[in-house]
Amino acid sequence: MSPQGQLTRKSYLENKIIFVDGFVGGGKTLFCQLVSSLDKVEMWVHRPLVEQVSGLYAHKNIDLNTAVSLLNCCFDNEIYCQALLRDQNFRHFDHSSVFKFPKKSEYLKRVLNSNDLELFEKFINEKRVLHFMSHGITSHIEPIHKALGNRLIFCRLMRCPSSMYMLNHLARWSKRWGNESRNGMMCNDINGEMVPHFILERIDEYANANEYERAIIMLEEWIEEGNKAVENKKYQIIEVPFEMLVFNPKKYIQEVSSRLDVELSDNVLREMRRQKVPRKSLDDAPKSSIFQAYGWRQPEKHISAKDQIKDELNEMRGYLKSNMMKRVERLVENYVSRYLDFKL
């Protein structure tokens, strides 16, 4: 029997949803913590299903109606589960743990309340805001925007392509995506080489590259394709360059708060102090065993963002092939011109 029509699913809830999108090692945790400190905003979570659906649509594996219907199911279910604190991370040392939530007392009251209906109705009536961290889906924003419309607040966390910390992070993950159960990255299988879903224009080149070349290709694709989405004004994407955020955090957190129509409370100021912002230098972050495991080190001295970018480029020249180095230099030049208040 042939199907009589196309399955669809609308959204029944109206809570706003914040996305903070960026690459691994790009500074998302810092900004997500600040956003989580805003009134009505929930602790940030990572839900791979949203990235997977967006990737499937971007690669034309599913149509827009299917993508939107799946996202509507996902978002409505997430709102209900969040109201009851289901699917929350209670591991104390994880960055995404509820113990890192700037307003922990709110969650303590919620977790001790056994009345499901009361919790859900309160969540809806207070217009609580969901908060997702995502990885490299700015250029895949269309189905998310179609599903949420003016409920969506999409932030794009950028970091200069000269960042050695970010480059090393991406290189390591390029060997893991599509090859282990821990991550939910959708990939193209090109003769046994796994190409992550956010690569659309450089699939064959990525498949034939080594891990550091892949890191550069990822940055190139994410930046250039993401810029096209930013230029489409219907999405109203908030761009947050890491090099500006760490020195002037209020500017960017106020952009989000104004969309939510909330003021910056003492919770925000306290979280700024915990995150050591404003900072004396880019890497002057709070100590973290997790970040240290990925290569972060406390700076021995404080230097300007301009000098750090120059030092990182010089370090890259020591081990990148000349053709890849030229691509990095072009990306850095464009990044500095677009976001920063100095010239190299």
Task: Please name every model-derived segment.
Residues 47-132, 189-204, 309:
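PAPS-dependent sulfation machinery
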Residues 133-136, 148-170:
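Conserved phosphate-donor/acceptor-positioning beta-strand/loop module used by diverse small-molecule
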Residues 27-40, 144-149, 169, 239-264, ...:
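PAPS/PAP-binding and catalytic site of the sulfotransferase fold
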Residues 1-18, 195-213, 220-223, 227-239, ...:
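PAPS-dependent sulfotransferases, especially Golgi type II membrane carbohydrate sulfotransferases
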Residues 8-38:
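Walker A (P-loop) phosphate-binding motif
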Residues 18, 42, 153-155, 238-240:
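Hydrophobic/aromatic beta-strand patches that form the interior of the parallel beta-sheet core
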Residues 21-22, 131-137, 157-159, 241-243:
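Short His-Asn-centered micro-motif
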Residues 27-32, 50-54, 138-141, 162-167, ...:
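Short catalytic/ligand-binding loop motif for oxyanion handling, primarily in non-cytosolic enzymes
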